[in-house]
Amino acid sequence: MSWQNNLHSVSPYIAGEQPELTDMIKLNTNENPYQPSLQVQKVIEDFKSENLRLYPSTDAKFLRKALAEYHHLNTDQVFIGNGSDEVLSLSFLTFFNGQRAILMPDISYSFYPIYCELYRIPYQKIPLADDFSLSVNSYFQENGGIVIANPNAPTGMAISLQEIEEILQNNQDSIVLIDEAYIDFGGESCLPLLEKFDNLVVVQTFSKSRSLAGIRLGIAFGSAEAIAHLYDVKNSFNSYPIDSLAQKIGEASFTDETYFQKSVSKIITTRENFKNELIKLGFQVTDSKTNFVFVHHPKIDATTLFKVLYEAKIIVRHWNQARISDWLRITIGTDREMNTVIQFLKEYLKNKEKSY
């Protein structure tokens, strides 16, 4: 028998393009357009390379303590992983045993079903409404767990804290995992609900609002028992997943709250201005609470618009996927970058009108 017959085949996640050209306006992977805080830069400058000969802390205890204090939690309620993708992967493996289907929106982060296929976890996609809103009542059914990105990606839309609490109250025998990768851009975090629900696990990241996508740091918050189980699984794979420099950078990123709030506020302001300009141009735009917008134009095919923008050295994100194939996701960059996009779209639409 050929060894290929024993392979476990999955369709891997396809990440956004990282173009080699440096003159592109890169708006396809939701990176923060602003640099990390000066505190982070100082840690990098002061880091002694001789320390790299030593293994890092196995549980990132100082970073966990800093996060616990920031969010008014106990240290044993905090888990640190190598990016939120690893945290999500380990969470699926830890909390969803595969006996019953887990529930997730049909339009959401495309890594979720891949984890299910990889770990042989049955899952059921719950359709969003035509306007991409989520009905909490759809999650009041038997399940092996629930996974919801809030705010959602790629739609950018958020559900309220009250709606999350309703889901938790009606699913107290299942883990409810809320992925808050974009929470700092306008959503309402459900971390306060950890006091009431031991079946809640909240995942966040340093990549977006903290401008640290390059160092790969992710977080899970939950009950002490849930986090202990998560560490048991993590340590069964790798007891040293977070390097020493990343741990120090993570700590430093939470010491400059003024810079953090200023950076996030700038992105939100730019997003709202960009949304308004798109609407003036005839685009349909969802009510984004993230650092991106999800857009559709009734007169322009999204595939065509994606290619036209790319040729103009503006790279955005498009999925050839049911229900959203005629939509584009556009990361919020600097004011200058977004103004460039608007001016290009104005010119493109004007020329298109002339050709009719």
Swiss-Prot record:
GO biological process, one term: L-histidine biosynthetic process
Keyword check for Repeat: no
An MF annotation (GO) of this entry: pyridoxal phosphate binding
N6-(pyridoxal phosphate)lysine modified-residue sites: 208
The keyword Amino-acid biosynthesis belongs to this UniProt entry's keyword annotation: yes
Reactions this protein catalyses: L-histidinol phosphate + 2-oxoglutarate = 3-(imidazol-4-yl)-2-oxopropyl phosphate + L-glutamate
One family name in Pfam for this protein: Aminotran_1_2
CDD domains reported in the protein's UniProt record: AAT_like
Involved pathway(s): Amino-acid biosynthesis; L-histidine biosynthesis; L-histidine from 5-phospho-alpha-D-ribose 1-diphosphate: step 7/9
PANTHER family per the UniProt record, alphabetical: HISTIDINOL-PHOSPHATE AMINOTRANSFERASE, HISTIDINOL-PHOSPHATE AMINOTRANSFERASE 2
Name of the protein: Histidinol-phosphate aminotransferase
UniProt organism field: Lactococcus lactis subsp. cremoris (strain SK11)
